[in-house]
Amino acid sequence: MNYNHKEIEKKWQNYWEENKTFKTNDNLGQKKFYALDMFPYPSGAGLHVGHPEGYTATDIISRYKRMQGYNVLHPMGWDAFGLPAEQYALDTGNDPREFTQKNIQTFKRQIQELGFSYDWDREVNTTDPEYYKWTQWIFIQLYNKGLAYVDEVAVNWCPALGTVLSNEEVVDGVSERGGHPVYRKPMKQWVLKITEYADRLLEDLDELDWPESIKDMQRNWIGRSEGAKVTFKIEQSDQNIEVFTTRPDTIYGTSFLVLSPEHPLVNEITTSDKEQEVKLYQNEASKKSDLERTDLAKEKTGVFTGTFAINPLSGDKLPIWIADYVLSTYGTGAVMAVPGHDERDHEFATKFNLPIIEVIEGGEVQKYAYTGEGKHINSGELDGLENEAAISKAIELLESKGAGEKKVNYKLRDWLFSRQRYWGEPIPIIHWEDGSMTTVPEDELPLLLPETDEIKPSGTGESPLANIDAFVNVIDEKTGMKGRRETNTMPQWAGSCWYYLRYIDPHNEKMIADPEKLKHWLPVDLYIGGVEHAVLHLLYARFWHKVLYDLGVVPTKEPFQKLYNQGMILGEGNEKMSKSKGNVINPDDIVASHGADTLRLYEMFMGPLDAAIAWSEKGLDGSRRFLDRVWRLIITDENSINKKIVDSNNHSLDKVYNQTVKKVTEDFDTLSFNTAISQLMVFINECYKTNEVYKPYIEGFVKMLSPIAPHIGEELWDRLGHENTITYQPWPTFDESLLVDDEVEIVVQVNGKVRAKINIPKDLSKEEMQDLALSNDNVKMSIEGKEVKKVIAVPQKLVNIVAK
């Protein structure tokens, strides 16, 4: 008889809830384990089968660690601010609060039906004022530390969404959400000085147990490069152009300068006869994304400003051009073009017939850019030097002339933080009529997001909050001075930068969390989530954590010690699941048809946790069949314990049981759940082959199965005669001596040829091995009529007989 998953799963979910089985105590003396999931954005679509993969992995580890005696923190919450809820509200006229709350209820129900062992008393929601009070508090600390500032920057303006997007939210010139066109436009924005932490964000990656590929993505995003800052004087002007270059040694090969179309000097230095052409070009460039502009396959375009600069070492006059392949967001937004030794510059020079000067020998620079090593030529004092020596010498020369210095540059830009939307945390700043700016007093936090029916973006660059006079206008009670509240809101990233801290002490009204509790629980021991958050969320959270570390709020330099990215679950045809393809699988349907335990087991058995694997109904059915086999081994059709489960040990399962405990333990430690499940299947197959199964072995098996399939685990534990939940039962141990057989098979050779294979007790002496070998019938036949000259015995391996 198969088990009734609907009945069993509901029964144990109710039991866990009523008994608060997974409530985490703050026993600060106990060894701890903090297992964290990337909390979800509660969308209208609800959970899909991709969500439970990561959640099941952390849940297995959490249950496993509890059984190993750890104090486990395993929480869940909601990343509920952000564009999607607001977009839905705009499209349907529904309030984002109601929509978000309804979605959270659906998500929570679905998650609870999958049997995850979360401590729901620690649930957080980024849109809860008691939560975002502390998001605002962190912003104030950033502001006080000089890390939050207002700047006029060329931003990614998306008219359709009515807001500014960060570089990371723009893909191929369109918004990541919705695919709307994005344009570059100068606007006043709040910016966070993440660049101040660039070196630490880079260096501390080495201390983390993260996939190397993710570390590399962060390293590339930060993009540290060493070189020089070079100052070029503009002819007939007191202005200078500053350039960052990693190759100051090629300065004698500079034949022109290129500025980005947005460079602040462009309008100032352009001559009147070039004005119209330059303005037209700037306008065209503003419609292109950074990716389009830097596409190497794209034909180079540009316009001459009519003005020249002076090469500080050679004294040559250099025409100043603008071109969209130079970005204002990288380096200084200006490039010293060395067409002889840079492919993009060569392409540009060839198109506009600009000089190409060879300064490193070894190529044919009139035909193509030579980017290899070589001796310097046509380079004054640098002649004859190789690259590295020439770089040092060039910096020395520039410094002596006051025209440059050694410099480290980062690709990383400061974090564009403000959003012109309604559904986000209000920024706690007041702008006063005398031009000054102050933060909202900390004792007045949270600064509440006002309720309103009018949440449409203003389209002018201001958020909908600008339309709410009662929110915007303030008067200083002491001075009578009038002020306006900041109307921009924070991005969705803000709440997710620090949520892992709030789980540690979620109801604390006086501080983010108690310092002693932070000291106990940090860092997070295991963080599992999708690879799509490799750069943004993880980099932003690391940045905030380091600021809080500097402020003495948190005791660790890094938030997440071990990171693991689960793979993607694809549709049956190896295609990405999507509504448009109609191949999305709803976990509710699987829970109803096969049970939550089957879904959990199947998603862990599909393949390695980090691989992209196609969904298979056959695989799902196979996982259910295995659980039915487990059930039938222990429970009879009459609903009683199988008589073959006995209290005495006939030792037939000693080896496979101990092997199973060892393998499952090791595999859980490395998140190799698919191979752990394979071993559990091996054990069950062996149990079916024997007449008797030793009860402690079955109990050990149920303990090992329960983190993966907790409902059937609890039910079988209960049926085996135990009153308490299996949750805190000690994890099984194995006996090393039982991992090997008492007997071994040895080979018997006569004159080098195998004549017999025999099983012998493994502790037999050499003499006993020889006697056994010589008494074997096959061996006797082989040596009949011959004289045995020598017998060599190798314990547990072979006996070699030489006979003539």
Swiss-Prot record:
Short motif ('HIGH' region): ranges: 40-51
Transmembrane spans: none
EC identifiers of the protein: 6.1.1.4
Location of the motif 'KMSKS' region: 576-580
Alphabetized Gene3D superfamilies for the sequence: 3.10.20.590, HUPs (3.40.50.620), Isoleucyl-tRNA Synthetase, Domain 1 (1.10.730.10)
Family classification: Belongs to the class-I aminoacyl-tRNA synthetase family.
NCBIfam families named in the record: leuS_bact
Protein known as: Leucine--tRNA ligase
Organism: Staphylococcus epidermidis (strain ATCC 35984 / DSM 28319 / BCRC 17069 / CCUG 31568 / BM 3577 / RP62A)
Lineage, broadest ranks: Bacteria, Bacillati, Bacillota, Bacilli, Bacillales
